[in-house]
Amino acid sequence: MMFTRAQVRKQKTSNSSSQRPRSSGGSTRHETRYKQSSTSSSGAGSGLSGASGASGARRDQYRDRDHYGKHSFELPRQHSKEEAYHRDRESSAGGVDRGERSGIGGNGGGVTGGGVYVDRRTRPRSITNRRGAIKHQKTHDINGHRFVAKFFRQPTFCAFCNLFLWGFGKQGYQCIICQTVVHKKCHDKLLGKCSGSVFTSASTILLRERFKIDMPHRFKPHTFMSPTFCDHCGSLMGGFFIQGLKCEECDVNCHKKCERLTANLCGVNQKLIVEALNHVKRGAREARDSPSTPPSLNPAYKIEASEEHDETSYTYSQFQKSGRFTAPATVIPRFKNYSVDDFHFLAVLGKGSFGKVLLAELRDTTYYYAIKCLKKDVVLEDDDVDSTLIERKVLALGTKHPYLCHLFCTFQTESHLFFVMEYLNGGDLMFHIQESGRFSEERARFYGAEIISGLKFLHKKGIIYRDLKLDNVLLDYEGHVRIADFGMCKLQIYLDKTADSFCGTPDYMAPEIIKGEKYNQNVDWWSFGVLLYEMLIGQSPFSGCDEDELFWSICNEIPWFPVYISAEATGILKGLLEKDYTKRIGSQYSPAGDIADHIFFRPIDWGLLEKRQIEPPFKPQVKHPLDTQYFDRVFTRERVRLTPIDKEILASMDQKQFHGFTYTNPHITLD
C-alpha cells in the first residue's frame, strides 16, 4: 500500500510525544498546509483547495537547487507576527460563518481568500542529533565569468593557454554560466567577457571598445579524423562524423553547443596580449614607485615583510602594550616551530569529513591540547585553502579574549594541517542539551552573556562568525564557555561592507542568507537567537521535513513560545528572531538597541563577566586531565591514527598554497 508524504507526515505527527499539545483547530490548520481535503465545511472548501494548490506549487518550485538568491522563499503577502498570530486565533475560534466572510475556513486558519497559505507559526522540533554546516561552492568572478573549482572526469584542455589540465582532485576552473574551462592560474587573464553574463548579451563589448577587437569566428561543420578537444569547454568532441565546428580562419574547434558562447577572438592570441599588457603595467608601476631618495629616507616607500612574520610581530607588540604581561617560569620561544613529533596522540575527540580532532600531550611536559587535523587533499578539493588560513588568523586573535578558543600553534606535514588548541574537557552545549533536555533561565542567561561577549569582540574586529550553534560552544573545566571552529568566518566587514556567501548550518541560517541577499554581522544575532531558543526550550524553533521546507519555515513562520518561559525570555527571543535584520536586536548600533541592555540580561554584571569573575551555574565533573566523559564514546573508543593520503595524490598537490600556515602564538606561555 502506497502512502503520500503528507499521510506519512500526519502519522508521524500523531505518534510523536515530544511535540507540544495543540487544539484540534490548530492541528487541522497545520495539516492543511500539506494535504488536499476531499471534504470541507461550508465556506472553507475553496480556501483549503487553494492552499493545497499553493503548497504543491511551492514544493515543485523548490526542486530546483537554483532558487537560492531569487527570493523564492518569500510569500507574496506578508503580515506582522502579532497580526498573523491574532488572525489565526480569531479564525480558529470564529467558526464557519467568519470563514465564509473572510475567505478563511474555520479550521483552515492560515489560508487567505486568495488561496495563499500565510500561517506564520511553526511547530518546534526536538534536538536529537548534530547538524553539520553547509557552504555553497566558492565562485571567482572575472569579467562576468563565475568560475568554480571542478573535477574533470575526462582529459580536458585550458581555453586560455591550450595546455592540458593535470592533477588529481579539482584540476581547474569552469564557468557555471558559459562552461569555459581554464587553469586556476589562467582564470583571471581572460580578455573576453562571459557570453552568458548578466552584464551584457554580447561577449565582446569590452574588447571592441577598448582594444578594437571584434573578430567573429567563421565556424563550419567538420569531421575530425583524430580525437579532438573543444577549445571552449576543453572536453573531447565525441562521435564519428561531424563531431563539431571548425573555424575556417584560425582553426579553432568547438562543440555545436559552444558556438554561441565562444568569444569573438578569431586570430587573437589571448596569452600573448595579456603578457604584453602585464609588461606595460609593470613598467609603468616601477616608474611611478621608483624612489628619488633612499628607501630609508622616503616615508612613502615600504618594504613589506612576510604575512606570518608581520602578524606575529604585531600581536606580540600589542600584547606588551596591554600591560598585562607577566613573566612566567618558562616562555615559549617567540619563533619556535613545532612539528608532529613534539606531540603524543592519546585519544580521538571528534571526527568529520574534514579530518579528526585528537587529544595530545606535549612531549616531556604535562600539557594537553586538542589538535585539529585536516587532510590537505580534502582542503584543496573543496577549495578551502583561504578558509583554513582565515581560521588560523581568527584563532590567533581569539587569544586576546576569554570566551574564544585559544590557539597554541599550527604546523603542517606533507599530507596534513594541524591546529593545536587548548583542550576544553567540559564538552559542548549540544552534549549538555541532550543530557539535560533544556537549561534553566539562569544557566541559559549565563552562557548567552559569555557568548555575546565573544561575538561582540569578533564584530569589533570586522569578523562575521556565521556558524554559531550548540556544537561550536564548548565548556572549560570551570564551566565557562569558549566559541570554537572559525572556518566559516568572513573578515574585514566594517561599516557598510557586506558579505553574500551562502554558508552556515541550515537550522541557524538567517533569512537574508537564505534569500541570497547581502548581509553583515546581524546574521550572527539571528543564529544567537536560535541557540538561545534551544537552550531555553530544548527544541529547534523552525522545522521542516527537508532542507527546502526548513528554509521556507525560517523565512515565513514564527516560532512557538511556551508559557513556562518568562516574559523577558520571550521578548528577547522575538527581538533576536526578527526577520527584518534592520529591526533585529543586536549590537549597540542597532535601532532595536544593544542586546546587553535588554531586561533579560539585567542580572548580569558585564564588568565582572569580562574578567571571568562570575561563578558558572554548572561545573563539569572532570576527574583528571584525560577525562573524556563529555565526549561521544563512538569517537573516544577509536584507534588513534592519522588517515593516510594516496601517494599519487600527495605527489600532485601544490604545497605552495599552504605557505605561511605554520605559526606559534607568542601570547601562550608555559607556566
Curated annotation (Swiss-Prot):
Residues annotated to bind ATP: L349, G350, K351, G352, S353, F354, G355, K356, V357, K372
Disordered: region residues: 1-136
Stretches that traverse the bilayer: none
Family affiliation: Belongs to the protein kinase superfamily. AGC Ser/Thr protein kinase family. PKC subfamily.
Lineage: Eukaryota, Metazoa, Ecdysozoa, Arthropoda, Hexapoda
One GO cellular component, as annotated: plasma membrane
Keyword field contains Kinase: yes
Boundaries of every Protein kinase domain copy: 343-601
Source species of the chain: Drosophila melanogaster
PROSITE patterns the UniProt entry points to: AGC_KINASE_CTER, PROTEIN_KINASE_ATP, PROTEIN_KINASE_DOM, PROTEIN_KINASE_ST, ZF_DAG_PE_1, ZF_DAG_PE_2
First-tier enzyme category under EC: transferase
Protein name per Swiss-Prot or TrEMBL: Putative protein kinase C delta type homolog
UniProt keywords, alphabetically: ATP-binding, Kinase, Metal-binding, Nucleotide-binding, Phosphoprotein, Repeat, Serine/threonine-protein kinase, Transferase, Zinc, Zinc-finger
